[in-house]
């Protein structure tokens, strides 16, 4: 029986390029000269840390970062979980943006429920941070891909491991 997996993985190369571009733009901006404005990517933990002198500066850094992510096709802008702004020494602030990787249990259940309610003759099962969809024909699976793409637009999904 044909099957495929629905997953959500971060393209770390594109994300790193976007953060590097944003870092260069921050270093070159005249209103950030002489300030502690910076941006860091921790690939291992999946965190982007923004440093600045005020909340306004953090907003400006985000205004630089998000379009850079869109240009580099790092669909991670939808994946960012904005943590609270933290005050650090003196009047400096930092904010951590956590990158959500994989499909969490809530979204996986939503996908399975959508497929059951859709009336398409497929079976969906949750396997860790992926959802495996199995159907009788390849055409039905292609309908499922189109249906899921249309139904879930708030989180980037990839469809892979297509087996016949």
Swiss-Prot record:
This is Nucleotide-binding protein Mfla_1706. GO terms for cellular component: cytosol. Gene3D superfamilies: 3.30.70.860, YajQ-like, domain 2. Keywords: Nucleotide-binding. InterPro entries: DUF520, UPF0234-like_C, UPF0234_N, YajQ-like_sf. HAMAP family: YajQ. The keyword Nucleotide-binding applies. It comes from Methylobacillus flagellatus (strain ATCC 51484 / DSM 6875 / VKM B-1610 / KT). It comes from the Bacteria. The keyword Nucleotide-binding applies. Belongs to the YajQ family. Nucleotide-binding protein. It holds the Pfam family DUF520. CDD domains: YajQ_like. GO terms for molecular function: nucleotide binding.
């Amino acid at each position: 029986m044909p099957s495929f997996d629905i997953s959500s993985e971060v393209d770390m190369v594109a994300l790193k390029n976007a953060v590097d571009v944003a870092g260069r733009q921050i270093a070159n901006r005249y209103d950030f000269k002489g300030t502690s404005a910076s941006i860091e990517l921790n690939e291992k933990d999946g965190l982007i840390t923004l440093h600045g002198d005020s909340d306004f500066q953090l907003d400006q850094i985000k205004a630089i970062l998000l379009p850079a992510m869109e240009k580099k096709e790092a669909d991670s802008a939808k994946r960012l979980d904005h943590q609270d702004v933290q005050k650090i020494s003196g009047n400096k602030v930092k904010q951590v943006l956590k990158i959500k990787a994989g499909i969490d249990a809530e979204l996986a259940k939503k996908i399975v429920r959508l497929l059951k309610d859709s009336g398409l003759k497929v079976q969906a099962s949750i396997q860790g941070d992926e959802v495996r969809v199995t159907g009788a024909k390849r055409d039905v699976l292609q309908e499922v891909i189109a249906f899921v793409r249309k139904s879930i637009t708030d989180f980037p999904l990839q469809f892979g491991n297509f087996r016949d």
